[in-house]
Amino acid sequence: MPIITLLTDFGLSDSYVAEVKSVLLSRTPGVTLVDVTHQVAPGDVRAGQYLLARSWQRFPPGTVHLAVVDPGVGTARRALAATAGGHLFVAPDNGLLSFLDRPQFVSIPVSADAAPTFHGRDVFAPAAAALASGKRLEDLGSAITDATHSPLPTPHHDGTAVMGEVLYVDRFGTLISNIPGPDVEPGVRIRVAGTDVGALRRTFGDAERGTLVAFVGSGGTVEVAVRDGSAARLLGVGVGAEVRA
């Protein structure tokens, strides 16, 4: 049974998600559709890349991942399909797929009757349905080697500490960094934008209510939260804030 995941910035107050799903369901009988999220902030390609990067490998090989965060829709930016790690991807050529390791890309032709403001429905969804139905990548377009590459920032060592930054803020106000948990020695204190958070704990539940706590989150990197509160709001920081271990 084919699986297609969906990640967009369309939100849920309009008909956009349903219109995309209508294409997928009508062209791929028996498909399972999985919503990763439709609540990416409008046009936030970096957030879309982060969420897709941490979720795609949870699915079985052969899954098709349809990702549409596309502030350049209708312009000269290309539409892409790709394969990597036994999975298939469909997305705009704006860096959304920069996390892939050794991908193969093709450029998908845009039909003349595609709505210039809704390639998610008229270009990307048909391509995802074709792949989920067994079409080969090369059947969808011409191979390219110059896809836009804008990877997420990586941490570095400055000689005394691991220096990273906040990659994403979740709906709880948790600050999710790019520092891998194994890079932090036991007892090392975590600082966010100059504020001392303390050493890593096992989980946010180990902290007192209303206090900051650092831990290794389910994505494998250092996170900073407030138990029963919002670290982003308490500290007044967001994506890009410095994290030091």
Language model features: what each stretch is:
Residues 176-236:
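A conserved acidic, glycine/proline-rich C-terminal tail/linker
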Residues 239-245:
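Surface-exposed interaction regions enriched in Ser/Thr/Asp/Glu
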Residues 8-10, 36-38, 68-71, 84-85, ...:
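Fold-independent oxyanion-binding glycine-rich loops
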Residues 3, 27-30, 47, 60-69, ...:
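Active-site histidine-anchored catalytic micro-motif
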Residues 15, 19, 28, 43, ...:
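Conserved active-site and cofactor/substrate-binding residues in soluble primary-metabolism enzymes
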Residues 114-179, 183-184:
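Anionic-ligand-binding alpha/beta catalytic cores of soluble enzymes and soluble regulatory domains
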Residues 3-5, 31-34, 63-66, 79-81, ...:
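Structural motif
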Residues 1-76:
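N-terminal glycine-/serine-/threonine-rich phosphate-binding loop
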